[in-house]
Amino acid sequence: MTTTETSLSADTKNGIDFKIADLSLADFGRKELRIAEHEMPGLMSLRREYAEVQPLKGARISGSLHMTVQTAVLIETLTALGAEVRWASCNIFSTQDHAAAAVVVGPHGTPEEPKGVPVFAWKGESLEEYWWCAEQMLTWPDSDKPANMILDDGGDATMLVLRGMQYEKAGVVPPAEEDDSAEWKVFLGLLRSRFETDKGKWTKIAESVKGVTEETTTGVLRLYQFAAAGDLAFPAINVNDSVTKSKFDNKYGTRHSLIDGINRGTDALIGGKKVLICGYGDVGKGCAEAMKGQGARVSVTEIDPINALQAMMEGFDVVTVEDAIGDADIVVTSTGNKDIIMLEHIKAMKDHSILGNIGHFDNEIDMAGLERSGATRTNIKPQVDLWTFGDTGRSIIVLSEGRLLNLGNATGHPSFVMSNSFANQTIAQIELWTKNDEYDNEVYRLPKHLDEKVARIHVEALGGRLTKLTKDQAEYLGVDVEGPYKPDHYRY
């Protein structure tokens, strides 16, 4: 689907507004969704536990998170617990169009008479389309009943509301600077256009929102920045730093999906190749382990000496980008930072080497610099481009335009590991919605006993049997027989 900003408009059927690629894909999406449900015991357990209680009744959740089959199970869990939901993807390439169709049609609808949830997402959005979808996700049909909860991945939905409110209070949307990214220019353009027609839209939404739950490292960083500046207008729960999210989704999910993305994108043999992983946090650990398991010769870059030492103890060389870039066959960024692989690094890469990102945003790789460099871009297939430098004749294979290759070139993390993350998201939404008066406008983490609850569900689903403490043993350790078993400062 390709449209211009001026021609974008939502479709409406059976009272549901939406914008997706193809409603006729719903049956395929529903079949995959049913399989995913069997692989997502955390979400299905929460449905059984809370279906009668309806703890999210009255919640109007605006969700910005990759519109995948696994996310479809999350959305239908939220609605099963009483919430109303509107959704958009948090990445221009990550939507699975059949999953989006299944959610709009719903379990009891048809493409002719959908009975599901409004979704605004399709694979391959332009930046203008992406931010239009984000606004639609946050714009509820009844202006007197705006969104009152946000479920976010990367912080774009939260940023749209908070920056919009900030500029409304200032009475002006600032102009874009010449060196601003293309996306920031589109973002400011959207806010400026909306300010001309409604000077209080985002303030009204911000005042209605009871809280936000954030999925990712990048989004959490944004939340802490808003809080430090005094600009966080509602409570936030940092889902990312739940142990059953960061130590599972970030590491084991990446370990699975990185290889999947490279294989689907390039069919290149990984064994024997020299691989450079930029960043050795939880995501980088999963990347390095995956590549090592394929027989690659792996090097790692790091700023933190503790992470660097961990990498070396696992047998990885710790190097700088400048030292290693010229010898690497595959380069993957996983830092959550910006300006990791710059144009001069790309020019130094081997002919036909592979470059991709599995952090969050495309600013880990200097895609803007590459586009301005005069290099010729040849599209090989969707989300696979060959960039050729005229002065050297060397070509570089870039995956997903520098955005998340595991979602752009493949289908993201597997259902079971996402069950951990999305169970945390659901619990966090319930926590903020039902106990809102216990939270200030700060960033919180879920309590340890809820983290252990999520883990316990998945241990049992895999057939594990937990040892139970005796009363004497529990007293000896200074914990309750039923947990939590570790202090908050414990490093898993």
UniProtKB/Swiss-Prot annotation:
It comes from the Bacteria. This is Adenosylhomocysteinase. Its main location: cytoplasm. Pathway: Amino-acid biosynthesis; L-homocysteine biosynthesis; L-homocysteine from S-adenosyl-L-homocysteine: step 1/1. One of its GO terms (cellular component) is cytosol. It holds the Pfam family AdoHcyase. The keyword Hydrolase applies. May play a key role in the regulation of the intracellular concentration of adenosylhomocysteine. It is found in: Cytoplasm. Belongs to the adenosylhomocysteinase family. Its cofactor is NAD(+). InterPro entries: Adenosylhomocyst_ase-like_sf (IPR042172), Adenosylhomocysteinase-like (IPR000043), Ado_hCys_hydrolase_NAD-bd (IPR015878), NAD(P)-bd_dom_sf (IPR036291), S-Ado-L-homoCys_hydrolase_CS (IPR020082). It comes from Mycobacterium marinum (strain ATCC BAA-535 / M). Keywords: Cytoplasm, Hydrolase, NAD, One-carbon metabolism. Coiled coil: none annotated. Transmembrane segments: none annotated. GO terms for molecular function: adenosylhomocysteinase activity. Substrate binds at T68, D153, E215, K245, D249. Disulfide bonds: none annotated. One of its GO terms (biological process) is one-carbon metabolic process. The keyword NAD applies. Its EC number is 3.13.2.1. The gene is ahcY. It catalyses: S-adenosyl-L-homocysteine + H2O = L-homocysteine + adenosine. Binds 1 NAD(+) per subunit.
